[in-house]
Design a protein with these regions (language model features):
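Extracytoplasmic beta-strand/coil segments of soluble accessory domains associated
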Residues: 1-30, 48
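Short acidic/polar hinge/loop motifs at secondary-structure boundaries
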Residues: 27-56
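Transmembrane beta-barrel wall of Gram-negative outer-membrane proteins
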Residues: 98-125, 136-207, 238-253, 257, ...
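Flexible loop and strand-edge segments within Gram-negative outer membrane beta-barrel domains
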Residues: 174-180, 193-259, 266-289, 320-321, ...
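Outer membrane beta-barrel strand-and-loop segments of large Gram-negative receptors
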Residues: 287-294, 333, 418-424, 430, ...
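Gram-negative outer-membrane beta-barrel transporters
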Residues: 302-304, 445-453, 470-552, 594
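C-terminal beta-signal and adjacent terminal beta-strands/loops
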Residues: 396, 449, 454, 572-621
Length: 621
């Protein structure tokens, strides 16, 4: 939702504080929720799988997941003995549009009959991203050319030339390069049906922050003087995180509770924003998250789990653009999820009570929030494996420290942001209906949903300026979200040794505030159609993805044009039925289209990457 070096997921039009990003059940413990230019500390090429959580089950992980959660599963803490003396996975890849060079490897080694040692590492480096046309949107180019004309008329030809140069920038996105590396080590103890493990990890990245061309703002120096900054100045972020994790899964026998699951994560996170060669603003966050969950043995048709969760975050920022004061957030929660099956009907219920304390020490402000969330789901198992379901929910979210206490220039959003220490809890009532299952040999999923928000928290432009930046305030107003999602995967040909599959996907969401204005950054309708041929040695896939334009915008947004992406991929398994070696060749955005995602804060000056050829090899032994 921001740029190549820093992006977060968008689920059903929700992002930021309303979508929780997890690593094996606990938070990533970075500060990506505080600003869209702050990266998540997850290296994609070391991920084993990704789960998108919605419905009653999401209440196990926090009221912040009011819009859903993304749970990233990796292998840093081993939970089973390898089948061989050691197991090695390796990956290497390159691409053309960003000059990507990347590699990763992980190794699991059995020690005796009960211990497993794991180590993994990765490295990734890119250059500036190439694009198929102008960097700036037509609206922003027109604005800069008008400013250039004004500067020329005022007798400032050098500044006019700078504006014209920025408006004419095309072919690549300056300062969009990045480099990152990770190193993780873990140890797992397997004792029958119980497992224990711990891991240590290091994440290090450096990436460019892409500023809006032509931006200027002033900030006060320590001595009280004001220094003017040009938006074209190169800004980079150097980010480091040390992380320690523990995981336990204890088998309790055949009583009421089958097992006890323990999970703890500790993070020491620092990132520094460099303005040229000078240190600008430093963000530091130390956090601990711990959870204990008791899983019930199935009693008849009843199963479930209950637990407790604790969250502690100590956040500190210092520098000219430390727009959030030092703050401490503590949360304690209890939760339960219960499932009851009666014949073809399954009932699922979840509840979560959460107690949050947010304190800004330097301001002398402390806020307490007690929130309760609940969800109820009903699923009917129809004929031939088709499932029909409906979920209802009521969720509450305490305001974040950033929403409460922000007060300063935030260059990532091109705004001077002002929080409100008197914000109330945000409440959402949700209703979701779905049908999913099989159609012959194919599968489908159709979902319709609606969410009614009370006290929805959002940024609103005030019409004022501070430090040459527009002033935005965090406000609250009721809001209404609704949308539909559809997926179909069907084999057109299914014979021994050859399959031809089709994929069809559609997604649409609409949202508006109680006063009838649009909620900002809502994605438009998107459609995807694909054909995929599969043989013993080859997979060949071609897809077309279309994004509608978005003209339902707020006063401070610009409309976004529609665009179409055409992609292709070939995967070759030289050992045929053996999956140990896979070579991939891919082409993304074949027609070099300039596309802009409306959900992005920076879509007017950070378009999608242009035509990109990728090659990779994956080994597993």
């Amino acid at each position: 939702s921001f740029a190549p070096g820093s992006s977060r997921p968008v689920l059903r039009g929700q992002q930021g504080e309303r979508v929780r990003v997890l690593v094996d059940g606990v938070g990533t413990a970075d500060v990506s929720n505080t600003s869209v230019d702050h990266a998540t500390t997850i290296e994609p090429i070391t991920v084993e799988r990704i789960e998108v959580l919605r419905g009653p089950a999401v209440l196990l992980y926090g009221s912040q997941a009011i819009g859903g959660a993304v749970n990233v599963i990796d292998k840093r803490i081993p939970t089973r003995m390898p089948d061989e003396a050691f197991h090695l996975d390796a990956f290497a890849g390159v691409d053309s549009a960003t000059n990507l060079r990347t590699g990763a490897a992980s190794l699991d080694v059995g020690i005796g009959s009960n211990l497993v040692f794991h180590v993994d590492g990765s490295w990734r480096k890119t250059g500036n991203a190439e694009i198929g046309g102008f960097q700036l949107s037509p609206e922003l180019r027109e604005e800069l050319l008008e400013e250039a004309a004004e500067k020329q008329a005022d007798g400032e030809p050098e500044e006019a030339a700078e504006f014209r140069e920025a408006a004419g920038q095309r072919g690549f996105i300056p300062n969009s390069d990045m480099e990152s590396w990770t190193l993780n080590a873990g140890l797992g103890l397997i004792l029958g049906e119980s497992t224990f493990g711990a891991s240590l990890g290091w994440y290090d990245t450096n990436y460019g922050v892409i500023k809006r061309p032509g931006l200027k703002h002033e900030h006060s120096e320590e001595g009280g003087a004001e220094e003017e900054e040009e938006g074209e100045e190169i800004v980079r972020i150097g980010l480091k995180q040390f992380r320690a994790d523990f995981k336990g899964d204890i088998y309790l026998g055949e009583g009421f509770f089958e097992r006890l699951k323990l999970r703890t994560g500790y993070s020491d996170y620092t990132h520094t924003e460099f303005e040229g060669a000078e240190v600008g603003t430093t963000f530091d966050s130390k956090s601990v998250e711990a959870r204990a969950e008791l899983v019930q043995n199935t009693e008849g048709s009843l199963r479930g789990s209950s637990g407790i969760q604790y969250n502690h975050r100590d956040f500190f920022a210092v520098g000219a653009e430390a727009y959030v004061p030092p703050n401490l957030t503590e949360q304690l929660a209890v939760f339960t999820l219960q499932e009851l099956g009666t014949g073809p009907i399954q009932i699922e219920a979840a509840a979560r009570a959460e107690f949050t304390n947010v304190e800004a020490q330097t301001l002398g402000i402390e806020r307490d929030y007690d929130t309760f969330s609940g969800a109820l789901g009903l699923v009917y198992e129809g004929i031939e494996g088709v499932r029909f379901g409906i979920n209802g929910s009521r969720a509450e979210r305490a305001p974040s420290a950033e929403e409460l206490f922000s007060d300063g220039p935030h260059i990532a959003t091109q705004a001077f942001e002002i929080g409100d220490a008197n914000l109330a809890t945000e409440r959402a009532w949700g209703l979701e209906a779905f049908a999913r299952g099989s159609i012959g040999k194919g599968t489908f999923n159709l979902t319709a949903y609606r969410q009614w928000f009370d006290n929805y928290i959002f940024l609103e432009e005030t019409g004022l300026e501070e430090d040459d930046l527009p002033v935005f305030e965090y406000l609250q107003q009721d809001a209404d979200f609704w949308g539909v999602e559809a997926e179909l995967r069907y084999p057109l040909v299914d014979t021994e040794g050859f399959r031809l599959l089709t994929d069809l996907n559609a997604s649409y969401v609409e949202a508006e505030l109680a006063d009838g204005t649009a909620v900002p950054r809502i994605p438009p309708l998107s459609l995807l159609g694909a054909l995929e041929a599969q043989t013993r040695s080859f997979d060949v896939r071609g897809e077309v993805q279309w994004f509608d334009g978005q003209d339902r915008v707020t006063s401070f947004e610009t409309p976004t044009d529609s665009f179409t992406l055409v992609n292709a991929l070939i995967a070759w398994r030289p050992l045929a039925d053996n999956q140990n070696v896979t070579v991939q060749l891919a082409a993304d955005n074949l027609f070099d289209v300039v596309g802009r995602r409306h959900a992005s804060f920076t879509k007017d000056f950070v378009p999608l990457v242009g035509r990109n050829f990728r090659a990779s090899i994956r080994l597993s032994f």
